[in-house]
Design a protein with these regions (language model features):
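Terminal, low-structured helical/coil segments at or just beyond the last alpha-helical repeat
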Residues: 234-268
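Surface-exposed loop/turn motifs in large extracellular/passenger domains
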Residues: 140-142, 179-185, 236-242
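Ankyrin-repeat boundary/"N-cap" motif
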Residues: 21-30, 52-67, 86-97, 116-135, ...
Length: 268
């Protein structure tokens, strides 16, 4: 039974008007963008189904494709689940929830899932033919990452490449210039596992399909971190500088802190 049909039944049962439903539907899209857990729950309580579609995709993928990054992401996913989300891939759902206990149980039954490929629309570093560890990196889900590694996931596993040959990034790429540095816990986790910081990819199409889409050619995790200084990324210059210093020390043993951050020339 489709999500739209379910919503129409709910509208009839609760005597919502179509306008009321659409108002809540559009409100839900805004609440997803803001990672407003209570706002999402309110919309589901007023006739919107978590199994509805938006832009020809299930609503849950609007959540995974938005640009906001926060610790509330997993709670937003939980709101979908609590209102009877129909999601077939329970292993992926466990990762999105950062439910380590559930993930561990599923992987005991299906250990090969650590190498399964996924493609999700993503506002930043592409999630094209990635595995679950890339997804953990994107959303800063350390507990799930620890379970995946325990079950044999490789911290240097590579994503797929597109028709141009771009891609092939390892999970740490998703952490080095993340929105508001929200993947710093995963960054530190990968460093604790001695992830390879010298892997160079042909290029990455950052923000593919969004207004900020940008080709970033020939990068490794350290140079990719520097791309956070691009104006379309809206990252903090001091934060990026600290990340680069951390990566340089981990990769090359160089203990260096940039002395001209923020850049004096640009402040004149």
């Amino acid at each position: 039974m489709g999500g739209h049909f379910i919503s129409l039944v709910i509208i009839w049962m609760h005597r919502f008007t179509l306008k009321q439903f659409m108002d809540y539907f559009h409100k839900l899209v805004e609440e997803i963008e803001l990672h407003s857990v209570e706002g999402i729950r309110e919309c589901f309580s007023n006739g919107v189904s978590p199994n509805d579609f938006f832009r020809n995709q299930p609503l849950i993928y609007e959540l995974t494709s938005e640009y906001t990054r926060s610790p509330r992401f997993k709670d937003c996913v939980r709101a979908f689940v609590d209102f009877e989300l129909d999601f077939k891939d329970k292993i992926l759902l466990s990762v999105l929830l950062d439910d380590a206990q559930s993930l561990d149980a599923h992987l005991k039954d299906n250990p090969e899932a650590v190498r399964k490929e996924y493609t999700l629309r993503c506002a930043y570093t592409p999630l094209y033919k990635v595995n679950l560890l890339h997804i953990c990196a994107e959303f800063n889900h350390v507990r799930s990452a620890e379970v995946l590694v325990k079950h044999g996931a490789d911290v240097n596993t590579k994503a797929g490449v597109d028709e141009y040959g771009f891609g092939g990034q390892t999970p740490i790429f998703h952490t080095v210039n993340q929105n508001s540095n929200r993947s710093v816990d995963m960054l530190n986790y990968f460093l604790s596992k001695s992830t390879d910081l010298k892997i160079t990819v042909t290029g990455l199409i950052w923000g593919k399909g969004y207004d900020w889409e940008t080709l970033i050619p020939a990068v490794n995790p350290i140079s990719y971190a520097m791309m956070g200084l691009l104006p379309q990324m809206h990252r903090d210059e001091i934060t990026i500088s600290k990340i680069v210093s951390t990566l340089l020390k981990a990769a090359y043993g160089i203990d260096y802190t940039s002395q001209n951050v923020p850049c004096r020339y640009l402040k004149e």
